[in-house]
UniProtKB/Swiss-Prot annotation:
Residues modified as N-acetylserine: S2
Phosphoprotein as UniProt keyword: yes
Subcellular location(s) of the protein: Cytoplasm; Nucleus; Chromosome, Centromere
Subunit annotation: PP2A consists of a common heterodimeric core enzyme, composed of a 36 kDa catalytic subunit (subunit C) and a 65 kDa constant regulatory subunit (PR65 or subunit A), that associates with a variety of regulatory subunits. Proteins that associate with the core dimer include three families of regulatory subunits B (the R2/B/PR55/B55, R3/B''/PR72/PR130/PR59 and R5/B'/B56 families), the 48 kDa variable regulatory subunit, viral proteins, and cell signaling molecules. Interacts with SGO1.
Region Disordered: start-end pairs: 1-52
The protein's name: Serine/threonine-protein phosphatase 2A 56 kDa regulatory subunit alpha isoform
Length: 486
């Protein structure tokens, strides 16, 4: 049905200029709006005057000859849509449809031989009529998925049952992809993928399962599904920077990647490097980082030669100003190091530990703490020990300086433990680095003293010249005074 909510312009007009300036007032207004939107408007198209539904006989009471025709009649009856924004209209018809949908779900779940070829058309029509619609822009242009409550679909009492029915249909032992492919085609899948932008997380969860089932059963649609997901992500990265269903699509991709045959195709490697790695730059990374990191690690477990370009890609996009994202990147790096091969580790140890050294030195204690936790990982410790000659010189200066200067006592304690571990790995190198570090510090202190001494002399010289100038001016004044007196 058409939305009864006010247009976005009217909503924004309700916020005064002073409220826009005052962030606290603005937030309270947004909170009030959020509460009003807890049940969002149904996005279904208006059908004009509604047809009143009348209950059909129960399927279980019909004879076997009548059941198939009655099944199709019920499917057709459920194509009629209702306005859930009007809580008092069509109550009887809404309840009849809800009960009918429940009955259809149970019917296909508990009976064999009911999904016959002639029923496929009516089944897909009913599903399409109920779930496919144009999703409107968010009611709140300042919507923050991490803070704000999503707009829930008002007609969920019916849509939920349609999704339940769809899943039972796809999972039925009687389901035949060879027949269904006439109706579940590229256009159908494209519309399904567009629904992943729904704000309602309940709907996205159903869509995730439905798309996964379709991918598994329709071999001819697999390449198309991957391509369309690729397009959605590219649009998300480079154009809109907004899509509600990124986490769900990545979750599906995780299992798809897991099933890729070896050797990996060039298109799959390109997807990793051109789509998944650049996705780390997204503002809302926290909403889908766990699923994104899982996909990346799945690729590396499939093909270890991808490790170097992946880590170099992450280092290229390393956050400069967002500590929360740095912590996420460090977590992902640890997941990658958990599956890395020693030969691949040697290729990236220098640039990687230069970045880890910077993170350890971070004034943000969570970033420093997350980087230092690498030394709690037994496998990473073994890799460090094998390559201690390269890694210790990179890390030493930062660690030693932090042990003396960091503001957070927890970080200082962690650094002492790391230094102790590194010293046990190679005591001689550790002592050499300690001596050279102290010597360097002495040289720096000496230079600093020399600089201070030089500035002191310059100040004295400046003062001396100023006094000389002042005396010269005084003497000239005296001479002129004496001359005029004579």
């Amino acid at each position: 049905m058409s939305s009864s909510s006010p247009p976005a312009g009217a909503a924004s007009a309700a916020i005064s200029a002073s409220e826009k300036v005052d962030g606290f007032t603005r937030k309270s207004v947004r909170k009030a709006q959020r509460q009003k939107r807890s049940q969002g408007s149904s996005q279904f198209r208006s059908q004009g005057s509604q047809a009143e539904l009348h209950p059909l006989p129960q399927l279980k009471d019909a004879t076997s000859n009548e059941q198939q025709e009655l099944f199709c009649q019920k499917l057709q009856q459920c194509c009629i849509l209702f306005d859930f924004m009007d809580s008092v209209s069509d109550l009887k018809s809404k309840e009849i449809k809800r009960a009918t949908l429940n009955e259809l779900v149970e019917y296909v779940s508990t009976n064999r031989g009911v999904i016959v070829e002639s029923a496929y058309s009516d089944i897909v029509k009913m599903i399409s009529a109920n779930i496919f619609r144009t999703l409107p822009p968010s009611d709140n242009p300042d919507f923050d998925p991490e803070e704000d409550e999503p707009t829930l679909e008002a007609s969920w009492p019916h849509i939920q049952l349609v999704y339940e029915f769809f899943l039972r249909f796809l999972e039925s032992p009687d389901f035949q992809p060879s027949i269904a492919k006439r109706y579940i085609d590229q256009k159908f899948v494209q519309q399904l993928l567009e629904l992943f932008d729904s704000e309602d997380p309940r709907e996205r969860d159903f869509l995730k399962t439905v798309l996964h089932r379709i991918y598994g059963k329709f071999l001819g649609l697999r390449a198309f599904i991957r391509k369309q997901i690729n397009n959605i992500f590219l649009r998300f990265i480079y154009e809109t920077e907004h899509f509600n269903g990124v986490a769900e699509l990545l979750e599906i991709l995780g299992s798809i990647i897991n099933g890729f045959a070896l050797p990996l195709k060039a298109e799959h490697k390109q997807f990793l490097m051109k789509v998944l790695i650049p996705m780390h730059t997204a503002k809302g990374l926290a909403l889908f980082h766990a699923q994104l990191a899982y996909c990346v690690v799945q690729f590396l477990e499939k093909d270890t030669t991808l490790t170097e370009p992946v880590i170099r890609g992450l280092l290229k996009f390393w956050p400069k100003t967002c500590s929360q994202k740095e912590v996420m990147f460090l977590g992902e790096i640890e997941e990658i190091l958990d599956v890395i091969e020693p030969t691949q580790f040697k290729k990236i140890e220098e640039p990687l530990f230069k970045q880890i050294s910077k993170c350890v030195s971070s004034s943000h204690f969570q970033v420093a703490e997350r980087a230092l936790y690498f030394w709690n990982n037994e496998y990473i410790l073994s890799l460090i020990e094998e390559n201690i000659d390269k890694i210790l010189p990179i890390m030493f200066a930062s660690l030693y300086k932090i042990s003396k200067e960091h503001w957070n006592p927890t970080i200082v304690a962690l650094v002492y433990n790391v230094l102790k571990t590194l010293m046990e790995m190679n005591g001689k190198l550790f002592d050499d680095l300690t001596s050279s570090y102290k010597a360097e510090r002495q040289r720096e202190k000496k230079k600093e003293l020399e600089r201070e001494e030089l500035w002191k002399k310059l100040e004295e010289l400046k003062l001396k010249k100023a006094l000389e100038k002042q005396n010269s001016a005084y003497n000239m004044h005296s001479i002129l005074s004496n001359t005029s007196a004579e």
